[in-house]
Design a protein with these regions (language model features):
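Alpha-helical structural segments
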Residues: 34-41, 45, 59, 69, ...
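Key DNA-contact positions within bacterial/archaeal DNA-binding proteins
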Residues: 65
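Helical hydrophobic small-molecule/effector-binding pocket
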Residues: 106-134, 139-144
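Residues at secondary-structure transition points
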Residues: 22-26, 30, 72, 76, ...
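Basic, helix-initiating cap at the start of DNA-binding domains
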Residues: 1-46, 50-59, 76
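Hydrophobic/aromatic-rich alpha-helical bundle segments in the mid-to-C-terminal region
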Residues: 143-215
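Secondary-structure edge/capping motif, primarily at the C-terminal ends of alpha-helices
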Residues: 96, 100, 137-140
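Residues in soluble alpha-helical coiled-coils and helical-bundle/repeat scaffolds
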Residues: 72-76, 124, 128, 165
Length: 215
């Protein structure tokens, strides 16, 4: 019988049986997860084209060639980060749905509202997931990235519909409001309505000076 061993297993076994002390090797799967989390943070700040891979590698404590050995290219790492980001939003909705208790909720509250509340809380505490969504949409001039973003977005919509059991109109409203919240949170404001104070103030600052008649 032929038994196949990977190089990492051989290295760990050799270290365990030798008299020499060596640093414990981190499994490739753990390194991959750590690199994806680091990529979420770095790509959220500077996007696909503005983020050097070696900055992500340094954050995890590995060499840049190792990153390419796992992901192949910076674009593939970016795609993995985007997919993980949307998966984490789906997991957030899972927890909100599981924790929703109609017995203690407000009379008109339901699972969909609980998921919306959880998302609002995430936006206030996790800017990386927010900004990576914007960076993903901004990179959609690349057809491969566009296809990935469409796919993860569509899966999230279907997931929310399954969890909530809400009709199409409410699901549409949920995601429209979510997009509105994303823009507001990115700008650091709480309101985007026409009559809100900061929009009125900005409009006054940009208004042309009055003419001779004072109008």
């Amino acid at each position: 019988m032929t038994v196949a061993y990977d190089r990492e297993s051989i290295s760990m076994a050799t270290s365990a049986t030798s008299g020499k002390t060596s640093r414990q090797r981190v499994p490739a799967a753990e390194r991959r997860d750590a690199l994806i989390e680091a990529a979420i943070h770095e790509f959220a700040q500077d996007g696909l084209h503005g983020t050097p891979v070696d900055r992500i590698a340094r954050r995890v404590g590995v060499a840049q060639p190792y990153v390419f050995s796992l992901f192949g290219s910076k674009r593939e790492l970016f795609l993995a980060a985007v997919e993980r980001c949307f998966e984490q939003v789906a997991e957030l909705f899972d927890r909100a749905a599981a924790e929703f208790d109609p017995a203690v909720a407000l009379p008109d509250a339901d699972v969909l509202q609980a998921m919306g509340t959880a998302y609002v809380e995430m936006l206030s505490t996790d800017r990386d997931r927010l900004m990576l969504q914007h960076q993903a949409y901004a990179a959609c001039d690349d057809a491969v990235i566009r296809d990935k973003v469409r796919g993860v977005y569509a899966r999230l919509v279907a997931h929310v519909q399954r969890l909530s059991g809400a009709d199409q109109e409410r699901i549409d409203d949920f995601f429209r409001y979510g997009a509105w919240l994303n823009v507001a949170a990115a700008m650091g404001v709480e309101d985007l309505s026409v009559g809100c104070e900061w929009i009125r103030a900005e409009a006054m600052d940009d208004a042309p000076p009055p003419g001779p008649s004072g109008v």
